[in-house]
Every structure is written in structure tokens, then in C-alpha cells.
Amino acid sequence: MEFSSFLFTILLFSLNISPLVSAHGSNHEDFLKCLSYRMNDNTVEPKVIHTSKDSSFFSILDSSIQNPRFSVSETPKPVSIITPVKASDVQTVIRCAQLHGIHVRTRSAGHCYEGLSYIAYNKPFAVIDLRNLRSISLDVDNRTGWVQTGATAGELYYEIGKTTKSLAFPAGIHPTVGVGGQFSGGGYGTLLRKYGLAADNIIDALVVDASGRILDRQAMGEDYFWAIRGGGGSSFGVILSWKVKLVDVPSTITVFKVQKTSKKEAVRIIKKWQYAADKVPDDLFIRTTLERSNKNAVHALFTGLYIGPVNNLLALMEEKFPELGLEKEGCEEMSWIESVLWFADFPKGESLGVLTNRERTSLSFKGKDDFVQEPIPEAAIQEIWRRLEAPEARLGKIILTPFGGKMSEMAEYETPFPHRGGNLYEIQYVAYWREEEDKNKTETDKYLKWVDSVYEFMTPYVSKSPRGAYVNFKDMDLGMYLGKKKTKYEEGKSWGVKYFKNNFERLVRVKTRVDPTDFFCDEQSIPLVNKVT
């Protein structure tokens, strides 16, 4: 099929499409026939192809929607869900979708802030749910491992923890987050100051490209490999697995929590934290969270991890950050894998097996983030505190994550994630609420407006030209493709430079080369060079 004919087919079926599963007509039926013929699905166990006619369809769809805000009847639904059991199944989906004009979303564990791993607007789409592709193979002697992208961070941590006490991997704090999206956008946790992002520690990958080929690092080339490690993998293909580099950790890790309920004291300590947290030795990570307690009063929580014993930590804190008042009684020594459980708020003594649980969150949320490059004034911290006292911030959080260390050592261009040296910390504003308590969406609007108001208030105090954002905290308020500008590139640049700064242009060039028909696209994907919207 010639490109012009193929493009016309895609455009034709992207117009006037209802979000209902039953309304997509013959091209969906042809897509399913293509899948069934190539996969011989009737003889495959477990079942791979799921449609709305199947009893499994909605349970599979809902099981990995990690933001209940999008688990409502109004949300567009896929025409089908495919749960591959082998790599060739993914190749088949891509080839059949290309042939029959079906858009594809790829879901690892469903934690996209805006639901774009299982939602598409105004076009028929299928979801590739990678839940069955979750094997993990570690090579402790060579400090490496292969991780399929249907696995979660918790499953990776579990395999590491049961295999070795001297190795770790620097990814996110929340164990239920999938490694597919997290690693392809960056991925950070308690080890980021020592070892950088998850993406910084990926040394190979297997990807299904727009032609349905399976490529490793050597076959895809260094530009392609660069793009998927921080540029958001969904713009470039379906990532099947990562080869990760494991990092060294000692037998003893120290963790601590210090809570401050006095506004005056907390504000004073946060002000000092801004000058210390990115400059202390990279063995130390101190995150600050502002939130409401059970008694509904705002408090500041300083949560830390030190790569080493408690006595060394206390000496360091006395020298670098005495204002926190850390005492030995507030610290606990443990192994790295135990610290993973501790940061995930599991009860003490819980078995490692809980890291493999895939429980779905019960709270809807909306989040935004910024990067802070100069300490914000005390008056601004006080105003943030005041805004957390609002009724709609009852379950809200403002999270300050320190950078520095390894994050400052790497250049902006080494991976697509550009927010490196010069950033003191990242600050995230998140509102949570219970969707079932707000049937008419009136309260939801209040929560969304609260996040917007905090974000607007912070404008003078955060990065500028561009105002940076983290692609893993995807925010549709930054913009989406609406066809209001001459080219998709012009639209995409408005938020692309916020996520990627100068790396956006290189990502566009890679995208144009490896996916010239823009098959792998969503409302905020990397555009082609001068593609007409």
C-alpha cells in the first residue's frame, strides 16, 4: 500500500468516531480477523484477544487503570485489548493495526497521570496490555538483568532482593508502577542522587518498531536507543524489555522520618533544606512532603535514606543539616530491599512478596510539577502551607525531591531527560479524591482548580524559558494536539520543550526517521518534522 493511500485510511477512520466500542464498523472487524488468523487465538491459552463481547474485557481494562478519574463511563474505550504472551503477538498487533487503521496504546501497569496508556480520543484504538510479558532474569556476576516491560518496579525489586544483598536498581518508590513507562520517561527514587535515573542505567532494550521488527540496541542504533531512555517510549515503538545495570549497595542502609507540625518551625527547616538537600554527599537523600495529618492539620515530613550506617549519618547531619534535629532514635538500619518496603509504607516485618502485588489505587488524582533552580522565599513556603489548609486539599500533597549528586554530573543531552545540573529540586503538586463520592463531578472541578491555583502561584519561583516539566508526570494542561496550528510539530513544541528542553529537536528527528507515518502517536507524543495536523 502506498503511503498516501495508507495515510488517507488513517485519517478517514480518525474522523467522527464515537468513543463507544460498538461503533467502529468493518475496519475493527477486519483488524480482529487479522489478529485471529495470525495468532490462531482460539487455540491459545491464556486468551490473548479480548473484545467487549467477552466477559473478561472490562475487568482487564479496569484492572490496570491506576487513576480512577478515568474509570468512568464517559472515558473512551478501546475496540479490543490484546494481552500478548510472546513477542510475536506484539508484532502481529502492530502489523494488523497498520493494515486496518487501528490506533494502538501500550500499557505496562497503567500509571500514566492522564491515562494515555489506555485512552485515545476521537479515533478507534486497541490496547496492548503487557501484563503477561513480565519475566525478569538477573545476572548477578555481571551486575545486569533483563526485565520485560509488563513487570512492575516492585517485581524487579523483589527479584533483586531475594537474589542478592549487595545490588540494587535506582527506580521509583512506588512498587506497583510498571517499568515500561517509568523507565522510558526517566524514573527516579531514593537512589537518584547516587546513581541517577532508571533510564541512566539501561544498557540495552528490545523494541517492536512501526514496521513490526524486533530491534535490540545494535540493530536500532544509538539515536533510537537514546530516545527511548527518557523520551517516552510510546512515541517510538513497543518496548518489550530492558537490560538494566544493577548498582552496588552496602549491607547497611539507614532510613529516617522527621515530622514537624509547627508551621513556624517547618517553614524554617524547609528554607534551610533548600540550601542543603542538593549539596550534601550523594549517599544521602532527603525528601520533603507537605500534607495533612489525620487530625486535618498540615505538617511537614522529612523522609530520608542514607547509604551507610546510622553513626555516619548522624555525624553528616550534624555537619550539613543540624536544623532538622535528627536523632538516633528516629533512625533505623536495614538492608536496601527492606528500605524499599519501608519507603512504600509496608508494615515492619512484611514479606518481600508484597512487592509483587498489583493492587489498584482507590483515589483519583491530578498532578503537576516544576523544577526549582533558586531557593524560594520563606513567604512563598508559608503560602504553600496555607493553600494546603483549603478543604479541597484534604488529601493533597506537595512533594519536594532533591537533585544534585549524580543528577548534576550528567549533561542535559546525555539522555532526553534534561533537568540535570542547576535544578535544586523537583516540586510536585497533587490533589487526591474519591471518585465515587463525586457523581456529579462538582467536587472534582474543585480539586483540579486547587492544583491549577498552586501551579499558577508558583510561577515566579520555578524554572523559566521553558518552565520545565517531567514527562512521567504527564499534564494535558500543557497542551495537546488539536489541529489549531499549521503543523503538528508547531503544536507539539509548545509542551515538548517543557518536557525535554533542547532535546526535543533531536527527539523529533529520531521520531521522523524511525516512525515516518506517525503510527505511534497520542495526544502529547513526539511529532514528525512539519507533519500537517
Curated annotation (Swiss-Prot):
List residues of the FAD-binding PCMH-type domain: 74-249
Question: What is this protein's function per UniProt?
Answer: Involved in adaptation to salt stress.
Q: Which UniProt keywords apply?
A: Cell wall, Disulfide bond, FAD, Flavoprotein, Glycoprotein, Nucleotide-binding, Oxidoreductase, Secreted, Signal
Is Ribosomal protein set as a keyword in this record?
A: no
Task: List the GO molecular function terms.
Answer: FAD binding; oxidoreductase activity
Q: Which Pfam families match?
A: BBE, FAD_binding_4
Where in the sequence is Pros-8alpha-FAD histidine found? H111
Q: Which family does it belong to?
A: Belongs to the oxygen-dependent FAD-linked oxidoreductase family.
Q: Which residues form the signal peptide?
A: 1-23
What turns on expression? By salt stress, specifically in the root.
Listed GO CC annotations: extracellular region; plant-type cell wall
Q: Where in the cell is it found?
A: Secreted, Cell wall
- Keyword hit for Transport: no
Q: Give the E.C. number(s).
A: 1.1.1.-
Q: List the disulfide bonds.
A: C34-C96
Q: What happens when the gene is disrupted?
A: No obvious developmental defects but reduced biomass and reduced leaves number. Increased sensitivity to salt stress.
Q: Could you state one GO biological process linked to this protein? A: response to salt stress
Query: Which residues carry attached sugars according to the database record?
Result: N142, N440
The protein here is known as Berberine bridge enzyme-like 28
Q: What class of enzyme is it?
A: oxidoreductase
Q: Which InterPro entries match?
A: BBE, FAD-bd_PCMH, FAD-bd_PCMH-like_sf, FAD-bd_PCMH_sub1, FAD-bd_PCMH_sub2, Oxid_FAD_bind_N
